[in-house]
From Swiss-Prot:
Keyword Lyase listed: no
Annotated protein name in UniProt: MSDIN-like toxin proprotein 2
Keyword Lipoprotein part of the UniProt annotation: no
Organism: Amanita fuliginea
Top-level lineage group: Eukaryota
Keyword annotations: Toxin
Per UniProt, location of the Cyclopeptide (Val-Pro) cross-link in this chain: V11-P17
Length: 32
């Protein structure tokens, strides 16, 4: 995972805990 994503993940999860899983799934798909 790139540094940019590593920095954004905590922010998205902190702002939208319920959508955290969706964001991670989208990021993993983009990275993969």
């Amino acid at each position: 995972m790139s540094d940019i994503n590593a920095t954004r993940l905590p922010v998205w999860i902190g702002c939208s805990p319920c959508v955290g899983d969706d964001c991670i799934a989208l990021l993993t798909r983009g990275e993969g």
